[in-house]
Design a protein with these regions (language model features):
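Active-site proximal loop and beta-alpha junction motif in alpha/beta enzyme cores
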Residues: 1-65, 70-174
Length: 174
């Protein structure tokens, strides 16, 4: 998210004071920003939380995303302590998947740092992915997908993603 080098970061919109915004307004703002994610911060409902958050892409709401979690936590730390602060602190963001604890380090003249703990681990879905459909989408042969006991699977810790093992590195280079 953040970097000490110009044009090297990953843009993120962080909207403070979103308590009065409706779902539709948040979605329209995310569409207007047209970034990969926009995170909206509201007053927390629980005293141990730093903020309640909602994460939107131009296409819809996400229950969790790492990029905005890190960005919002650093923005909260900078807002609370100033951009030139030299601190280590912890934020707790109330996200759709549950409370997300995020450790933040701010150092003057250096890129900010944050890391988080997920409230739940990724789980494998029972859904089966047809190799033919994957192969067609990837422009490869179905026989180039999977090897030994490694087969395509879907996982999720809030946002589903596919794990697609390829037969070898040459397939990935196509």
């Amino acid at each position: 998210v953040f970097t000490a080098e110009r044009y090297k970061g990953n843009p993120l919109a962080v909207v403070f004071g979103a308590d009065a915004l409706s779902d539709d307004e948040m979605q329209m703002i995310a569409i207007e920003f047209n970034l990969s994610e926009t995170i909206f911060l509201s007053a927390p409902e629980h005293v141990s939380h730093s903020a309640a958050v909602r994460i939107f892409t131009p296409g819809g709401e996400l229950p969790f995303a790492g990029h905005p979690t890190v960005g919002a936590s650093i923005a909260l730390a900078e807002r609370q302590h100033g951009e030139d602060a030299d601190i280590d602190m912890v934020t707790v963001l109330a996200e759709k998947i549950g409370p997300v604890r995020c450790a933040v380090k701010l150092k003057p003249g250096a890129a900010s740092f944050a890391e988080f703990d997920l409230p739940k681990l990724s789980r494998r879905s029972e859904e089966v992915i047809a190799r033919e459909k994957l192969a067609d989408a990837l422009g490869i042969s179905p026989s180039e997908i999977g090897f030994e006991n490694h087969v395509p699977t879907i996982w999720s810790a809030g946002v589903p993603f596919a794990m697609i093992p390829l037969r070898n590195l040459a397939v990935a280079e196509k």
